Amino acid sequence: MTESATSLREQKRWETSHRISMCAQRLTDVHGLDGFTMDDLADAAEVSRRTLFNYFPSKLDAVLGTIPELPPAAKAAFHDGGPHGSLIEDLGALAKALLAVKEPDRETMMLTRRVLVGSDRVLAAAHQRFEQLTDDFAALILEREGDDFPVEHARLAVRIIGALFDSALSTFLEGGDRPLDELFDLYLNQARSLFT
């Protein structure tokens, strides 16, 4: 199979996954997590039950959606000590590369945040997913920095990036015309000035 055919198939898979997730979030926003069935979700997303279950095993998984894969070039650059040569800045670049795979719009991010704060179960599941993502990113740091780098430092670095992203996201959701990645850079620079 050609690379373009593979990327087209991956693009279609991502679009279907995203559509299902957005429908799950809208249904959760309106009816609560227990207020709709997987059949309702399949109908709303215009997919068969079989397709729905091929993408997500549960409503909760559908609401949380799929975490996009890191672009291989960004992952390789990070592993090799780049793109900036500073762990925190390089982690920031990695996080922005992950976000850029399918950068959501303000309305989508507002819906996601409403759903998260509106349901303790969704929030707890999102926290578990963040912990897994923290472990994954910490593993990338340890691969890059070597065995002598403390795992606690790797996890702390990821959590710092998460806090900066959350601050940027809050500002982004308040409105204005600055894109999320610019706001992230702004908060990264502010954090750097606090620590120097």
Regions found by a protein language model. Give the residues of each.
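Basic, helix-initiating cap at the start of DNA-binding domains
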Residues: 1-44
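C-terminal peripheral helix-coil segments that are non-catalytic and often amphipathic
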Residues: 3, 174-196
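Short hydrophobic/aromatic patch on the recognition helix
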Residues: 47-56
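Short amphipathic alpha-helical segment with a characteristic S/N-K-E followed by hydrophobic residues
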Residues: 58-63, 73
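Short secondary-structure transition hinges
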Residues: 69-76, 107-135
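Hydrophobic alpha-helical connector segments
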Residues: 73-112
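Hydrophobic alpha-helical segments that form the core
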Residues: 116, 124, 151-170, 183-191
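Amphipathic alpha-helical packing segments from all-alpha helical-bundle domains
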Residues: 120-145, 152-159, 167
